[in-house]
Amino acid sequence: MLPCYPRRPIGGFRVAYEYANRLVARGHEVAVVHPRRFASATPLLATSFYQRLRRQGARLRDVLFPPHVHWQPIDKQVRMLYVADLDASQVPDGDAVFATSWPTVEHVAGYPACKGKKFYLVQDFDPWLGPRERLQATWRLPFQKVTVSRWLYKQVVDAEGGPENVVNIPNGIDHERFHLTADMGQRPKQLVMFFRRESYKAPEDGALALEIAKRGHPGMSAAVLGQAYRKPPRVPPWASYLRRVSDDQLIAIYNSSSIFVGSSLAEGFALPPAEAMACGCAVVSTDCGGIREFAEPEVTALLSPPGDPEALARNILRLLDDDALRQRLAAAGHERIQSFTWERSTDQLEVFMRKQVGRG
């Protein structure tokens, strides 16, 4: 159960699709349900006239241009369902039903038993995603929980009061796509960073860190990736801005860059830096929680406190000024991330599902 239509690349959606692809390859029947009406805590009448107008426009767009996932390979055996909302009548019966975000949990909680054993794929936690109390309340519902990092696992276990119904299964990386195509030691001093408008991504902090680093190392360049049609004003004028790149383009950018920069305040796992590691980038990031699953300070990455662009810039400059350190971190990160595979994650998920569905 996803919270909305897949109009743009979203990390949590990619995780769901990766599992769906691999589960159908193992003989399971999988349907991925996308509601047109966004599953959120904000009712339509409580929003502004402009927001209501945008939603009406989105409905018309969905009628004229049916949704299609163009940014992620989907196995033909996966049933991609696009429905009006997450009412139980819109959802097929099954052995297991997975909520993938806290708003979807609130819908799935009321489903009858014929929809399947209830699971919750916990992918994020931060106050920017919704009311903290409601979010944490979903962790206490009688679902079987799957967290994507030890950081999230600890928070869910603390909220639930024990680990009985919680398992940690880290995300995988598709190494057939995200892999080295260029020597890590022969790369230009180019940085790559995402500029996403969500406040918890703290894009302004990342942009400021780039500006500070540029003053200390004028020869550096940067590729900033985003969704907006126009280059955001906070993106430095000297940086290139690339909108809605494909995976092939992203892999090429990673392989032509030396350093990946992450500025988030909180992340459940942080797929982009993990995928950048797989492509040979040294990672400089905020210590945003779930990134610790693969980012070990001074070993596979340089981490700084969230909300401190000056500290982020200092770590960028450390790598720009010390190529041996950059190459050491890039090599260690690349080696570390090889153990994160979707096959391993799917093995663990399949075992957990069979155990819980059989128990039910």
Task: Please give the residue ranges for each predicted region.
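Aromatic "clamp/platform" in nucleotide-sugar-dependent glycosyltransferases that forms part
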Residues: L265
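A short, well-ordered alpha-helix in the C-terminal region of glycosyltransferases
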Residues: A311, R318, L325-S339, Q348-V351, ...
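Conserved acidic donor-binding segment of nucleotide-sugar-dependent glycosyltransferases
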Residues: R244, P297-E298, L302-P309, R318-D323
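Short acidic/histidine- and often glycine-rich active-site loop of Leloir-type glycosyltransferases
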Residues: P233, C288-E298, L302-L303
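Short hydrophobic beta-strand element within catalytic cores of glycosyltransferases
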Residues: A282-S285
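Acidic anion/phosphate-binding donor-loop and adjacent secondary structure
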Residues: P127-R134, V157-D158, N165-R187, A252
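Membrane-proximal helix-turn-helix segments that form the acceptor-binding/catalytic region
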Residues: A84-D93, D126-V148, L152-Q155, A159
